[in-house]
């Protein structure tokens, strides 16, 4: 390779990571993971005899795959590595929500928007603590990313772009999703990846666990150390390494270290989200930032499958009480951030939904896919508590009985007067006054984490001093700072 070609490839490596920022944040859970045999046609064994690549990308998920494709199209030889037997990472279970201003589809629908407005909204949602440089890269590349996804065959729902109710609304309709959620993105991305593997531009290693970043005496990252699924160790050298390894929601050790309060939250991310890449980056000298900032969504059933349904799609008939027996939020609040902030202030991220007989009879239980029979099954299991009186329910729940009685009495009075003086809930359809009464325990669920590797505007990993670690980049969920305090 000539000196000029080498310089061009280094420039291409720096350019390729921008797409990874835009692809790095997707939404809520859905369908199950892809089977390992779906990728047998492109799976490659580790071959130490051919260890050289221009670029190693660790993590074949929603940031790593687009980065690999982009790099290959720029003439970079790519080694894409993942410890799973499948590709896609969280795309296999996520809702696949992506956002962008001024996409072709948005313009065709006559929706007025701009990257500047997107930036302004994202800063507001992040409580103005976002890394502004990273955020600008993301919003300025977002429309091109969405257009590219459409070009390669991603199908978006007829409603896209739309206002997403699962988080605070943007000022314009700019959220997109596919009919098969995250898998709607993964299918076409897999096809594009296979094309470049077949051309010899990308080498894919699955079931390959990266154990260490290799560095020379100056600290420059020069490659990775890998163990295959048989335990065989190999080193792979490269001009640069991009970490797209995702977050650490599945690591009990890291959660207890950085934010013990959320350690009991239900893990809904895949087991691979164990923070491996972050730990390796830290060992190589990179600073980790925002590590205490997890996104712990309220609504998971503590001890059982299922999740609460929220306004505006569902308005619960019961009330929510904390472990002190008190209401703590307007259960019908349209803004999910209002509910989440109130939830995050609760002890151990836990609370209870209180219902009565009428909610069961009317199938107004408020838990996705739960009917009367499922409620009865969970009572039998001991997860849901049932009693003929509120006083008896409080005793079974193990919370202050007198306070629970007072809370329910106050709520029932609000139904009669039509005024919720405490939280201004508007829909006061029915009192909680007909036994048996039920208590469903609710906890948080962790899908993504916002802490990770500190990076500069080129997504180069940096030390706490701000010094760049040559040869090391991070993108997607592994790179921290873009989201600020956004939930």
Map each language-model feature to its residues.
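N-terminal secretory signal peptides and thylakoid transit peptides that target proteins
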Residues: 2-20
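C-terminal segment of N-terminal export signals and the immediately downstream linker at the start
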Residues: 5, 28-62, 72-74
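Core beta-strand elements of the Rossmann-like FAD/NAD(P) dinucleotide-binding domain
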Residues: 51-53, 231-240
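Glycine-rich FAD pyrophosphate-binding loop
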Residues: 74-91
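Conserved redox-cofactor binding core of oxidoreductases
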Residues: 140-232, 251-254, 301, 415-434
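Glycine-rich loop(s) and the adjacent beta-strand/alpha-helix scaffold that form part
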Residues: 236-307
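An anion/pyrophosphate-binding glycine-rich loop and adjacent beta-alpha core
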Residues: 278-280, 286-397
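A glycine-rich dinucleotide-binding beta-alpha-beta segment and adjacent secondary-structure elements
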Residues: 403-486
């Amino acid at each position: 390779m000539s000196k000029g070609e080498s310089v061009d490839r280094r420039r291409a490596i720096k350019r390729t990571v921008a797409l990874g920022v835009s692809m790095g944040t997707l939404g809520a859970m859905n369908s199950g993971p892809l089977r390992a045999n779906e990728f047998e046609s492109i799976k490659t064994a580790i071959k130490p005899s051919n260890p050289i690549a221009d670029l190693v990308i660790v993590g074949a998920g929603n940031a790593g795959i687009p980065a690999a494709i982009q790099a290959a199209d720029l003439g970079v030889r790519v080694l894409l590595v993942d410890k799973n037997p499948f590709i896609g990472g969280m795309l296999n279970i996520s809702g696949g929500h992506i956002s962008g201003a001024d996409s072709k589809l948005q313009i065709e629908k006559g929706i007025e928007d701009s990257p500047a407005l997107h930036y302004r909204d994202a800063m507001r949602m992040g409580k103005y603590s976002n890394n502004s440089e990273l955020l600008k890269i993301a919003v300025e590349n977002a429309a091109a990313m969405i257009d590219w996804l459409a070009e390669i065959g991603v199908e978006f729902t007829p409603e896209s772009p739309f206002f997403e109710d699962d988080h605070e609304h943007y000022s314009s309709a700019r959220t997109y999703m596919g009919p098969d959620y995250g898998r709607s993105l993964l299918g076409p991305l897999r096809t594009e990846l296979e094309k470049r593997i077949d051309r010899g531009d990308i080498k894919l290693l699955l079931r390959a666990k990266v154990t260490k970043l290799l560095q020379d005496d100056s600290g420059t990252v020069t490659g990775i150390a890998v163990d295959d699924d048989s335990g065989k160790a190999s080193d792979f050298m490269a001009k640069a390494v991009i970490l797209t390894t995702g977050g650490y929601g599945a690591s009990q050790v890291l959660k207890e270290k950085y934010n013990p309060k959320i350690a009991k939250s239900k893990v809904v991310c895949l087991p691979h989200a164990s923070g491996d890449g972050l730990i390796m980056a830290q060992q190589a000298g990179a600073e980790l930032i925002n590590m205490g900032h997890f996104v712990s969504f309220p609504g998971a059933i503590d001890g059982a499958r299922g999740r609460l349904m929220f306004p505006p799609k569902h308005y619960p008939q019961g009330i929510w009480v904390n472990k002190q027996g008190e209401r703590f939020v307007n259960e019908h609040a349209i803004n999910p951030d209002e509910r989440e902030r109130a939830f995050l202030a609760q002890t151990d991220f836990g609370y209870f939904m209180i219902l009565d007989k009428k909610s069961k009879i009317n199938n107004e239980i408020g838990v996705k896919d739960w009917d009367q029979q499922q409620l009865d099954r969970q009572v039998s299991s001991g997860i849901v508590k049932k009693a003929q009186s509120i006083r008896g329910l409080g005793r079974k729940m193990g919370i202050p009985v007198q306070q629970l009685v007072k809370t329910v009495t106050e709520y029932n009075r609000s139904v009669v007067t039509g005024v919720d003086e405490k939280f201004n809930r508007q829909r006061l359809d029915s009192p909680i006054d007909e036994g048996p009464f039920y208590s469903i325990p609710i906890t948080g669920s962790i899908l993504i984490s916002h802490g990770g590797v500190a990076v500069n505007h080129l997504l180069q990993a940096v030390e706490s001093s701000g010094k760049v670690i040559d040869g090391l980049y991070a993108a997607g969920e592994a790179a921290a700072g873009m989201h600020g305090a956004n939930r």
